[in-house]
Design a protein with these regions (language model features):
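Class II aminoacyl-tRNA synthetase catalytic cores and aaRS-like
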Residues: 1-426
Length: 426
């Protein structure tokens, strides 16, 4: 019991920042067995993980932890409302199912009445939603639990996770894009850290273009940096690490990083990409200096045709078989570190499209499926027949596959399913 009164000093950052309670009587409803708590509740995220899990009921009292659960509830509710508004039916599919080949290992559940046999927990409701499509449910979705026996990733919990799963019958790639471009931006803007999200239509970037321009099929479009292929200039370079290699450069204007900071960032990039990177800069006087400058000075006229080499420009260099991947890491790392090159306060979406249908396998040396073999090849049966007749290179065939990327993170993957047995056989 007590009195609620107005605070003398208000704090607008607190939910109860304008009032306070002056207790008149306190009744203890449950006594603690210990003289002190295992950790401070409002700082539980700083505690040892084992302690947090042991005293999970205390950890969840931390507003920062609790708010994550509340946020998830609000986002899921908003997704349900938006998908329903677009004519989708929420249909819950079975959890206990038969094992089928997927991308990870299955979790198995022993079948009590059938010794030696097992159910599998679904890695994704693929077969069930295909069954729904053939049964006449033309728009399906669910907040689907997915169980995958795989190692933890930086952006995914091990074991299980939930995803917005959807399927559309008689739909084109653009039909799918239209739904998600309408559903996602308002939800990100309302519940996300930033209140600005890309408006529809999102940028469509071909897979090969993404690799050539951004060094990644998950580009962060908030960053204004790109990589340039200058391999031909270094075919006979005096600098052995670049000689005859794939060489990609990223020019960063108005960069004020010190030599020590640059080399620390390059070291971090090397850990991420597994490939050593190099650098040089254009100083205040417009002269090339630092790093590998002495090996590129004679090539400055040619480099200026593809790079901007104004004073105070830093150039970072990736070389070798993994130059593309390394360049992508350089772009994201230096784009975030160099002031003025990253618009952080927004969500920037894009679609990665035109994935190659085939590639040459690293081990087999033969033609193999590049990604999803069950997707529709762009151009259908005719393009496969042209490849069979030798009229086109099979490596030029693209598939109706797509990834949705936001701020350098892959949010989802999808494809137009190959429903034609003749095309599948071919």
């Amino acid at each position: 019991e007590g009195t609620v009164r107005e605070r003398d000093s208000k704090n607008a950052k607190l939910p109860t920042g304008e009032i306070e309670v002056v207790p008149g009587k306190i009744e203890v409803l449950g006594r603690c067995q210990h003289s002190e708590l295992p950790f401070q509740i409002n700082r539980s995220r700083e505690a040892d993980e084992t302690q947090r899990l042991k005293y999970r009921y205390l950890d969840l009292r931390n507003p920062a932890v609790k708010n994550n659960i509340v946020l998830r509830c609000q986002v899921v509710a908003a997704l349900r409302a938006a998908m329903t508004e677009h004519g989708f039916l929420e249909i819950t599919t079975p959890i206990l199912t038969a094992s089928s080949p997927e991308g990870a290992r299955d979790y198995l559940v022993p079948a009590r009445k059938h010794p030696g046999k097992f159910y599998a927990l679904p890695q994704a409701p693929q077969q069930f939603k295909q069954l729904l499509m053939t049964s006449g449910f033309d728009r399906y979705f669910q907040i689907a639990p997915c169980f995958r026996d795989e190692d933890a990733r930086g952006d995914r919990s091990p074991g299980e996770f939930y995803q917005l799963d959807m399927e559309m019958a008689f739909a084109t790639q653009e039909d799918v894009f239209a739904v998600l471009e309408d559903v996602l931006p308002p939800i990100f803007a309302k519940f996300g850290t930033y209140d600005v999200a890309s408006a529809a239509p999102f940028r469509r970037i071909p897979y090969n273009t993404a690799l050539e321009t951004y060094g990644s099929d998950k580009p962060d479009l908030r960053i204004d940096l790109t990589c340039k292929n200058v391999s031909k200039l270094f075919e006979n370079s005096e600098f052995e690490p670049l000689r005859g290699q794939t060489v990609k450069m990223v020019d960063i204007s108005d960069c004020t990083l010190t030599r020590k900071q640059v080399e620390k960032l390059l070291s971090d990039c090397e850990v991420q990409s597994g490939s050593k990177a190099y650098w040089f800069k254009v100083d205040e006087k417009g002269e090339l200096a630092g790093g590998i400058a002495k090996f590129v000075t004679d090539l400055r006229p040619q480099l200026e045709q593809v790079l901007t080499l104004a004073p105070n420009t830093l150039v970072v260099v990736a070389a070798g078989a993994s130059a593309t991947k390394s360049a992508g890491v350089l772009i994201k790392t230096f784009g975030a570190a160099c002031a003025g090159h990253m618009d952080q306060e927004r969500y920037e979406f894009c679609w990665i499209v035109d994935f190659p249908m085939y590639e040459i396998g690293d081990e087999s040396g033969e033609l193999e499926f590049c990604h999803n073999p069950f997707s529709m090849p762009s151009g259908g049966l005719e393009v496969l027949l042209k490849a069979e007749r030798g009229e086109i290179d099979p490596l030029t065939i693209t598939a109706d596959q797509y990834d949705l990327v936001c701020n350098g993170v892959e949010l989802s993957s999808g494809a137009v399913r190959n429903h034609d047995p003749e095309i599948m056989v071919k």
